[in-house]
Amino acid sequence: MSVTIGELIGNFILVTGSVIVLLLLIKAFAWGAIEAVLQARSQQISQDIDQAEQARLNAQQLEKEGQANLEASRSEASQIVEAAKETGKAQETRIVAEATEEADRLKAVALTDIEHSKSEAISAVKTEMSDLTVLLAEKIMGANLDKAAQSQLIDRYLDDLGEA
């Protein structure tokens, strides 16, 4: 099997011609469809890239909004805690003031009661003393005193007691 140069050149020309005819047929009938498919694929890839970029930008925006919401929530929580502390302090101050006021009121009532009891006791002692003084004076003098003399004697005796 020996191949000559003429056969090789003939085969080369035949194959080259077939390829050229095939390329011309492809260009005439299929190249538009192939180019359209490639163009559609290129557009689809470009759209996918644009959508991915838009999704990335949206995600960044949502992240920023989430951070802002988180900071706002933290700030609001801090304000709520601070308001609760202030309310607690105000209630503490109010309760202490009310307790102090109630203690002062009870102290004043107790002092009034003490003064009243003291006055009653002094009055009772004065009455008892005046009765005893009159009785003693009657026994010493041996006679009953009239009301004016009795009153004068009691007043003098009480004045002497007050000075002592």
UniProtKB/Swiss-Prot annotation:
Entry membrane topology: Single-pass membrane protein
Coiled coil regions, renumbered to chain: none
CC terms in the record's Gene Ontology section: plasma membrane; proton-transporting ATP synthase complex
SUPFAM superfamilies: F1F0 ATP synthase subunit B, membrane domain (SSF81573)
Function: F(1)F(0) ATP synthase produces ATP from ADP in the presence of a proton or sodium gradient. F-type ATPases consist of two structural domains, F(1) containing the extramembraneous catalytic core and F(0) containing the membrane proton channel, linked together by a central stalk and a peripheral stalk. During catalysis, ATP synthesis in the catalytic domain of F(1) is coupled via a rotary mechanism of the central stalk subunits to proton translocation.
Subunit record text: F-type ATPases have 2 components, F(1) - the catalytic core - and F(0) - the membrane proton channel. F(1) has five subunits: alpha(3), beta(3), gamma(1), delta(1), epsilon(1). F(0) has three main subunits: a(1), b(2) and c(10-14). The alpha and beta chains form an alternating ring which encloses part of the gamma chain. F(1) is attached to F(0) by a central stalk formed by the gamma and epsilon chains, while a peripheral stalk is formed by the delta and b chains.
Protein name as annotated: ATP synthase subunit b
Organism lineage: Bacteria, Bacillati, Bacillota, Bacilli, Lactobacillales
Gene: atpF
